[in-house]
Amino acid sequence: MTELKNDRYLRALLRQPVDVTPVWMMRQAGRYLPEYKATRAQAGDFMSLCKNAELACEVTLQPLRRYPLDAAILFSDILTVPDAMGLGLYFEAGEGPRFTSPVTCKADVDKLPIPDPEDELGYVMNAVRTIRRELKGEVPLIGFSGSPWTLATYMVEGGSSKAFTVIKKMMYADPQALHALLDKLAKSVTLYLNAQIKAGAQAVMIFDTWGGVLTGRDYQQFSLYYMHKIVDGLLRENDGRRVPVTLFTKGGGQWLEAMAETGCDALGLDWTTDIADARRRVGNKVALQGNMDPSMLYAPPARIEEEVASILAGFGHGEGHVFNLGHGIHQDVPPEHAGVFVEAVHRLSEQYHR
């Protein structure tokens, strides 16, 4: 078993005692850091950065050089899986990700391969191995994937969407086609996450960014059901240590009880959910991650500290809290404010772990 100098993130996910509340930030390797922008310029474009193991490792480590974060997260993108299925991912300036061949019907789904994680997605595994080597056991490495539903939204819509009318049309007019796609994605994501774990990821997270656009019943059928399948198929132990899994549905605060039944170790919360209420509802079943509004990092330092104190008090005493933002850090946040946030979590949380 690889010795970890700082394992408080893994311990908190498993609701074990820690000295202070662990903290990391979604998108902590990103455009708010000038050093990230420099490395990205060196790579040429976003996907070239993802596909170069040394550069992906460099940007993964950049935030850890600045801040005493308790975890590193693999630098990659949720759309690596659909890209490996041959949909032709490209990025349009100001438009975000697009696909040249969106999925329109059951026949399109039938043609999609289930990618081999060590072949078509080998560059991700190389990045995981490189990052693990360079971390030298300082902090754990988080691997991740998008959820089947969230990946399907991009694949069917052909890119980002505001109203999700194309995929909802498929969901209501041709549910069989959508279920076939989600099933294939669940198998692909299970293989992909297990390969990340074998390559060295010490925890994994499933990002269900668009689950919150569904009705409760549709969320159960088209999103949660497939995340549950993935959780059931994941390697839960590797290198002599439990591998915790976190589910995060943005806008999913009303479904926490159902999410906690999947067998995951932790639930990510966005900033619209009250953490005290969330803890009351899930009890000791799962750990909770979150959940400061990322926009709070625009506030003066004293206000950031006040918000950190309020969220810590909301969760209260005891184990099972990983502090994070409620979604990714914004690209124009002053890096010093992120530093205030991280330092405040450690300093102000000590009293809750005595």
UniProtKB/Swiss-Prot annotation:
Binding site for substrate: 27-31, 46, 77, 154, 209, 327
Locations listed in the record: Cytoplasm
E.C. no: 4.1.1.37
Pfam annotation, one family: URO-D
Keyword Cytoplasm among record annotations: yes
Gene Ontology BP terms: protoporphyrinogen IX biosynthetic process from glutamate
Entry's Gene Ontology molecular function annotations: uroporphyrinogen decarboxylase activity
CDD domains, A to Z: URO-D (cd00717)
Keyword field: Cytoplasm, Decarboxylase, Lyase, Porphyrin biosynthesis
UniProt superkingdom: Bacteria
GO (cellular component) term, any one: cytosol
Pathway: Porphyrin-containing compound metabolism; protoporphyrin-IX biosynthesis; coproporphyrinogen-III from 5-aminolevulinate: step 4/4
Site residues (Transition state stabilizer), renumbered to this chain: 77
Catalysed reactions listed for this entry: uroporphyrinogen III + 4 H(+) = coproporphyrinogen III + 4 CO2
Subunit structure: Homodimer.
NCBIfam families reported for this sequence: hemE (TIGR01464)
HAMAP family: URO_D
Described function: Catalyzes the decarboxylation of four acetate groups of uroporphyrinogen-III to yield coproporphyrinogen-III.
Protein name, UniProt field: Uroporphyrinogen decarboxylase
